[in-house]
Swiss-Prot record:
The keyword Oxidoreductase applies. NAD(+) binds at G212, K213, G214, S215, E216, S217, G218. PANTHER family: ALDEHYDE DEHYDROGENASE B-RELATED. It comes from Staphylococcus aureus (strain NCTC 8325 / PS 47). The active site is at E256, C290. PROSITE patterns: ALDEHYDE_DEHYDR_CYS, ALDEHYDE_DEHYDR_GLU. This is Putative aldehyde dehydrogenase AldA.
């Protein structure tokens, strides 16, 4: 399926500030390409510090009125955004596929619908949110209010551009904040098109979208004195810098960072379910998922039964044109990511690891202009191996044999990360005991990589701070105010 890019994407995009697309302070632009073909899709404005300052000041001004907008009005606007996203689902999904390289079947069924659902969800959350009143005694009352923080500064990664943006924008504006958000410079196009929906629905200045380099305008957002709350999804290395900026300015930060999650397959697992779950864990979105189940821990009793099934399953995955609805895996998002994956394959070949499936870039049948890689399965001798400790961020699965549940738990916890994990077992008690023992923010049982609204998502250890995608995430974007009332009209007698 070939599409006319200009039916979906503009030739150039400005910065979205105060409800309008505007020129930046510099004439510099960044080329945005289709990673599956190398084709130029658009050019975006390269924001500078002056543009960040402009956007933050606009957001500060908009906050004065937006923070006073009633919950019912805000909720209706969030629902309108969600409705319009769904009405334009096919168009926005195609933009995401063209810009990111992921299959159209994923962007149509997951990325855009789930983004829309987050706006609907947080509309309901604020409508049902209630403060509390505590009658301390007959003359004293304590009222607890939840108030917006102010201007949110956010930067999101390139692997789920629209969905990750929705994770931050929806709760932030639902709580009454305004936001300055920057998508990755390589995958900004879906959010820039969705800005047209914000333009229709929201007051000016509530959502402002900058484009540029993370090391430039992204860093300027996080270090701006006018930003009251930071939110970031990306690598742990950059997460440290964001945390440092938050500490320097004494503002709160929500960080969703890297992972090296363990997917544990017990000897009583339903193997049909496990094979599907393993593929969901490592091949979904080409393995470019922070929660990817990239360490497979298989009970020794079923190892020789499961591994050949995985080899066959991996070899049958259709990797190809992301616009083809039959494609199961598309292109990696860029050359840097492909090179990183290849470096780990080279490390495997130079070590005592054994490549059981895949391990090659795909260039035949018209794939030579993109960044396509085979689903790859690699057996490593133990969890100390480089491939079992470091985040690869691609369709590369390391498999380790374990003798019992405790060894699986110990290996799962032997990581600097703690974002997610999985357990496959037909014994729910056994699975729950492992889930409770593994130190991660999310554990799936008998499935993997499901990320609906209404279930908290976030990590332990170096995988981040805070939780998103559930009603408690609203508190990330709120201040708690206590109003303490004494109705006795009596002196205390201390002075």
């Amino acid at each position: 399926m070939a599409v006319n890019v200009r039916d979906y994407i503009a030739e150039n995009y400005g910065l979205f500030i105060n409800g309008e697309f505007v020129k930046g302070s510099s004439d510099e632009t960044i080329e945005v390409t289709n990673p599956a073909t190398g084709e130029t899709l658009s050019h975006i404005t390269r924001a500078k510090d002056k543009d960040v300052d402009h956007a933050v000041k606009v957001a500060q001004e908009a906050f004065e009125s937006w923070s006073l907008t009633s919950k019912s009005e805000r909720a209706q606007m969030l629902r309108d955004i969600g409705d319009k996203l769904m009405a334009q689902k096919d168009k926005i999904a195609m933009i995401e596929t063209l810009n990111n390289g992921k299959p159209i079947r994923e962007t149509t069924a997951i990325d855009i619908p789930f983004a829309a659902r987050h706006f609907h969800y947080f509309a309901s959350v604020i409508e049902t949110e209630e403060g509390t009143v505590n009658d301390i005694d007959k003359d004293t009352m304590s009222i607890v209010r939840h108030e917006p923080i102010g201007v949110v500064g956010a930067v999101v990664a390139w692997n789920f551009p629209m969905l990750l943006a929705a994770w931050k924008i929806a709760p932030a504006i639902a709580a009454g904040n305004t936001i300055v958000i920057q998508p990755s410079s390589s995958t900004p196009l879906s959010l820039l098109e969705v800005a047209k929906i914000f333009q229709e629905v929201l007051p000016k200045g509530v959502v402002n979208i900058l484009t540029g380099k993370g090391s430039e305008s992204g860093n300027a957002i996080f270090n701006h004195d006018g930003v009251d709350k930071l939110s970031f999804t990306g690598s742990t290395d950059v997460g440290y810098q964001v945390a440092e900026a938050a500490a320097k300015h004494l503002v709160p930060a929500t960080l969703e960072l890297g992972g090296k999650s363990a997917n544990i397959i017990l000897d009583d697992a339903n193997l049909d379910l496990a094979v599907e779950g393993i593929q969901l864990g490592i091949l979904f979105n080409q393995g470019e998922v922070c929660s990817a189940g990239s360490r497979l821990l298989v009970h020794e009793k079923i190892y020789d039964q499961l591994v050949p099934r995985l080899q066959e399953a991996f070899s049958n995955i259709k990797v190809g044109n992301p616009q083809d609805e039959a494609t199961q895996m598309g292109s990696q998002t860029g050359k840097d990511q492909l090179d990183k994956i290849q470096s780990y394959i080279d490390a495997a070949k130079e070590s005592d690891a054994q490549i059981l499936a895949g391990g090659h870039r795909l260039t035949e049948n018209g794939l030579d202009k993109g960044f396509f890689f085979e689903p790859t399965l690699i057996a490593v001798p133990d969890n100390h191996h480089k491939l079992a400790q470091e985040e690869i961020f691609g369709p590369v699965l390391t498999v380790i044999k374990v003798k019992d549940d405790q060894e699986a738990i110990d290996i799962a916890n032997d990581s600097e990360y703690g974002l997610a994990g999985g357990v496959f077992s037909q014994n729910i008690t056994r699975a729950l005991n492992i889930a409770k023992a593994v130190r991660t923010g999310r554990i799936w049982i008998n499935t993997y990589n499901q990320v609906p609204e209404g279930a908290p998502f976030g990590g332990y250890k170096k995988s981040g701070i805070g939780r998103e995608t559930y009603k408690g995430a609203l508190s990330n974007y709120q201040q708690v105010k206590n109003i303490y009332i004494d109705t006795s009209n009596a002196l205390k007698g201390l002075y």
